[in-house]
């Protein structure tokens, strides 16, 4: 089994599913080389629907090199409202051309602004704002420039088909972006919050410099880690590090470490604990690989969720209302359901209400939590940090097409899954190149 890059191992992604060398090559030579389009699953009314019943205006934005949070802030600032009144279903990467929905509360269609590098069209109105996961999935069109050995893609695909039980499959890891591409610390903040160590949470975000960020950022983080001089640190931190500067202002004004962490927008506060859950999930998936347990079919003790019958097969998601704990007598039956795409083997996104699997799968989860010094009760947290938990499929089966000249990948993934998790298998690059 091929070990992953150390940066990936630091976020729980310990292995590749394929042993073959990758194609190499470069991603995102230009934003147009990495296109992402939401597969929408959100009901709207006509744009002239009464605003009393439908206070949210829904727009579709095609963004060129915009981070989702930054665009939402720019949209809110341009129309003179709080960023908290802008909602979306999924966060997209800056270095791409992305098309996604945004919902804006109490905005008229005539007030939609023009924003640089963004094409915005009105879709309609809705009675509620978008929430995270309010989409069927995402469609990707990705071009790889100057691959070293594009012919290797075929061997990788064959190995992934063996891993996936006949069709190309990869571990459904949370990708590097979940934790921070160049500075993966969001899970460290989340783990500190779970341990009720707000000082460690704040300092994980403010300090902890990495060699992969600009030199002025590194110096600022080193300064604040060494001195705890909040006012002095404001003179060191570049203006572009907005969240850090807001935290420093709070600390300089006498606020607590928890107060500083709670200066983040509510969606980012949730992201910290979600990143910790994601790290635990990745560790569980990696340990399952290390033990040689299958991904495309269950073993006794697994918790299997049936597929959402309303979803397109390419982006089908597990349905929480239809699940089964696999006994020895049901392994073969459930394996057939999984093989046909009717069900998924799952692992937990641990929270207060998580029920552990039995047998080896349950032992793996308990072992990971014990190693991290965590329990389900630790997820019973105040405000935006609380999480009841859920489950997630451990196998990702992209509907994949590979073409050459140029080397390109086209596929669709369900909501919450990562294109880079597929691409890392084919390219075998440094995570920083993804």
Curated annotation (Swiss-Prot):
Matches recorded under InterPro entries: PsdUridine_synth_cat_dom_sf, PsdUridine_synth_TruD, PsdUridine_synth_TruD_CS, PsdUridine_synth_TruD_insert, TruD_catalytic
Catalytic site positions: 93 (nucleophile)
Organism superkingdom: Archaea
E.C. code: 5.4.99.27
Coiled-coil spans in chain: none
CDD domains assigned: PSTD1
Family from the record: Belongs to the pseudouridine synthase TruD family.
Protein name in the entry: Probable tRNA pseudouridine synthase D
Database matches in PROSITE patterns: TRUD, UPF0024
Pfam families membership: TruD
Alphabetical list of PANTHER family matching this protein: PSEUDOURIDYLATE SYNTHASE PUS7L (PTHR13326:SF21), TRNA PSEUDOURIDINE SYNTHASE D (PTHR13326)
Function, in words: Could be responsible for synthesis of pseudouridine from uracil-13 in transfer RNAs.
Species of provenance: Halobacterium salinarum (strain ATCC 700922 / JCM 11081 / NRC-1)
One GO molecular-function entry: tRNA pseudouridine(13) synthase activity
Keyword annotations from UniProtKB, A to Z: Isomerase, tRNA processing
């Amino acid at each position: 089994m091929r070990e992953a890059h150390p940066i990936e191992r630091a976020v729980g992604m310990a292995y590749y599913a394929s042993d073959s060398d990758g194609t190499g090559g470069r991603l995102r030579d230009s934003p147009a080389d990495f296109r992402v389009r939401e597969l929408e699953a959100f009901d709207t009314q006509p744009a002239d629907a009464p605003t009393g019943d439908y206070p949210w205006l829904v727009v579709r934005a095609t963004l060129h090199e915009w981070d989702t949070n930054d665009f939402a802030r720019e949209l809110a600032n341009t129309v003179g409202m709080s960023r908290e009144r802008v909602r979306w279903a999924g966060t997209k990467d800056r270095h791409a051309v992305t098309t996604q929905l945004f919902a804006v509360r109490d905005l008229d269609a005539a007030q939609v602004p023009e924003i640089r590098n963004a094409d915005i069209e009105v879709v309609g109105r809705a009675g509620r704002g978008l929430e995270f996961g309010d989409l069927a999935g995402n469609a990707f069109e990705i071009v790889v420039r100057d691959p070293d050995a594009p012919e290797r893609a075929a061997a990788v695909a064959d190995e992934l088909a063996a891993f996936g039980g006949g069709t190309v499959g990869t571990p459904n890891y949370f990708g590097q972006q979940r934790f921070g591409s160049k500075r993966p610390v969001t899970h460290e903040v989340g783990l500190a919050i779970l341990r009720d160590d707000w000082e460690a949470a704040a300092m994980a975000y403010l300090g902890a410099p990495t060699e992969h960020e600009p030199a002025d950022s590194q110096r600022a983080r080193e300064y604040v880690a060494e001195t705890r001089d909040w006012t002095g640190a404001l003179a060191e931190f570049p203006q572009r590090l907005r969240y850090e500067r807001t935290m420093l202002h709070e600390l300089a004004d006498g606020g607590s470490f928890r107060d500083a962490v709670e200066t983040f927008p509510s969606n980012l506060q949730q992201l910290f604990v979600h990143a910790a859950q994601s790290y635990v999930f990745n560790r569980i998936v990696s340990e399952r690989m290390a033990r040689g347990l299958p991904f495309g079919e269950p073993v006794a003790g697994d918790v299997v969720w049936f597929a959402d019958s309303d979803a397109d097969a390419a982006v089908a998601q597990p349905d929480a209302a239809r699940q089964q704990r696999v006994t020895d007598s049901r392994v073969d039956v459930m394996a057939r359901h999984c093989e046909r795409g009717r069900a998924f083997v799952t692992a937990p996104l641990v929270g207060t209400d998580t029920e552990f699997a039995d047998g080896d799968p349950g032992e793996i989860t308990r072992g990971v939590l014990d190693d991290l010094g965590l329990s389900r009760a630790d997820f019973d947290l105040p405000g935006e940090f609380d999480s009841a938990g859920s489950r997630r499929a451990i196998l990702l089966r992209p509907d994949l097409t590979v073409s050459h000249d140029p080397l390109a990948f086209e596929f669709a993934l369900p909501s919450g899954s990562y294109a880079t998790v597929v691409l890392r298998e084919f390219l075998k690059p440094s995570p920083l190149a993804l």
